[in-house]
């Protein structure tokens, strides 16, 4: 099964919620009323839902489903130039492989989102692109944190920089950057503890890790990626805001899209934070994490 089919299968719950009740061939107001309920239920959020309805109503289009598709694709595109091209009817090139801007990617997120597994999948993805990848097991507050990443490292033949439980994660991140440079690796993914976004001191710890990376290399980290569980819906948006305030996100990875009817939460995340979705995950397999393509996502969301 190709990734589009897996994405489509993964979005089945969200798609059912969006499509089931909408009488696309009915009169405009009837369609918009059902569409509003469906978008809100899929966690698109009130503000984004109102914007979608307003634009669809103003478009005067007969094919309402196509009008909704175009609007959703535009909202999932934080790059204004590409979004404008789409509005003008041009179809920008499909996204190329996701190339991190620098060599260090700091990976953050709350407990239980599958952060460590996602890092392993990222390692596999970049290995397949011919990159030399290294991991830093910075989740030193959790007994199994380093062990889990270490096991993945063995399976993927990726070196893992780690210390005993309770090691200062900032010091470990510093050492990992030095090791990456000394050994000539292309990419370093720094795992972090599954911090609860409501715990201020844990956010401070994250800032400290980011500063330590910058001390080891003033150019880094150019990328800070948040791993978010789609099942959390609107709460995921609140998490993203807190992390963005603390460490300045450059991308979001959304996991477990196959386990929720709240896949619409991607829209307010991009719209509110102006941060792109880098990857989406729709399964447990090592290849079930793929670069995010707004068009393929909306197609999978709205196609019967």
From Swiss-Prot:
Cellular component GO terms, alphabetical: cytoplasm; plasma membrane
InterPro entries: AAA+_ATPase, P-loop_NTPase, Signal_recog_particl_SRP54_hlx, SR_rcpt_FtsY, SRP/SRP_N, SRP54_GTPase_dom, SRP54_N_sf
Membrane disposition: Peripheral membrane protein
Effect of residue 87 to Q: No effect proteolysis
Catalytic activity entry: GTP + H2O = GDP + phosphate + H(+)
Broad class of the protein's primary localization: membrane
Presence of keyword Cell membrane: yes
BP terms from Gene Ontology: SRP-dependent cotranslational protein targeting to membrane
Protein's name in the database: Signal recognition particle receptor FtsY
């Amino acid at each position: 099964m190709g990734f589009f089919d897996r994405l489509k299968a993964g979005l089945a719950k969200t798609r059912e919620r969006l499509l089931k009740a909408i009488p696309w061939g009915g009169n405009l107001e009837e369609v918009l009323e059902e569409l509003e309920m469906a978008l809100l239920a899929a966690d698109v959020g009130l503000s984004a839902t109102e914007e979608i309805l307003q634009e669809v109503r103003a478009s005067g289009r007969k094919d309402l489903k196509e009008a909704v598709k175009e609007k959703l694709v535009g909202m999932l595109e934080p790059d204004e130039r590409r979004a404008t091209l789409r509005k003008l009817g041009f179809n920008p090139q499909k996204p190329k492989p996701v190339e991190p801007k620098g060599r260090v990617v700091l990976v953050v997120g709350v407990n239980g989102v599958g952060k460590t597994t996602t890092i392993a999948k990222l390692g596999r993805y970049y290995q397949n692109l011919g990159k030399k990848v290294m991991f830093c097991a910075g989740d030193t507050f959790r007994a199994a944190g380093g062990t889990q990443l270490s096991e993945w490292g063995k399976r993927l033949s990726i070196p893992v920089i780690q210390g005993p439980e309770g090691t200062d994660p900032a010091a470990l991140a510093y050492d990992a950057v030095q090791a990456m440079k000394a050994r000539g690796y292309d990419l370093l993914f720094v795992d972090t503890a599954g911090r609860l976004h409501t715990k201020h001191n844990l956010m401070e710890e994250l800032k400290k890790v980011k500063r330590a990376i910058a001390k080891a290399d003033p150019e880094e980290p150019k990328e800070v990626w948040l791993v978010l569980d789609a099942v959390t819906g609107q709460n995921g948006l609140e998490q993203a805001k807190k992390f963005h305030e603390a460490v300045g996100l450059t991308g979001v990875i959304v996991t477990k899209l196959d386990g929720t009817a709240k896949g619409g939460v991607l829209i307010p995340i991009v719209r509110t934070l102006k941060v792109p979705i880098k990857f989406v995950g729709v399964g447990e397999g090592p290849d079930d994490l793929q670069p995010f393509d707004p068009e393929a996502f909306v197609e999978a969301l709205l196609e019967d």
